[in-house]
Amino acid sequence: MPKLKTKSGAAKRFKKTGKGGFKHRCANRAHINTKMTTKRKRHLRGMNQVAKVDTASLVQQMPYA
């Protein structure tokens, strides 16, 4: 049986957590941030958890994560 391929786009965007979930970067932070308040930019700084309903599809996309 051939090896399963990892979706490279998903591998770049998501990281697996210790408990089997996934985390990702906050959206709306790439560019044109001058009009955002400092508070808004600060809250977008960290990582977010992926919803449980989306975890199954990420496991299929990244079989070796």
Curated annotation (Swiss-Prot):
HAMAP family xrefs: Ribosomal_bL35
Bridged cysteine pairs (disulfide): none
Source organism's superkingdom? Bacteria
Molecular functions (GO terms): structural constituent of ribosome
Query: In which family does this protein belong, per the annotation?
Result: Belongs to the bacterial ribosomal protein bL35 family.
Give any single GO term for biological process: translation
Q: Where is this region: Disordered?
A: 1-22
Q: Which gene encodes it?
A: rpmI
Q: Which UniProt keywords apply?
A: Ribonucleoprotein, Ribosomal protein
* Protein name according to UniProt: Large ribosomal subunit protein bL35
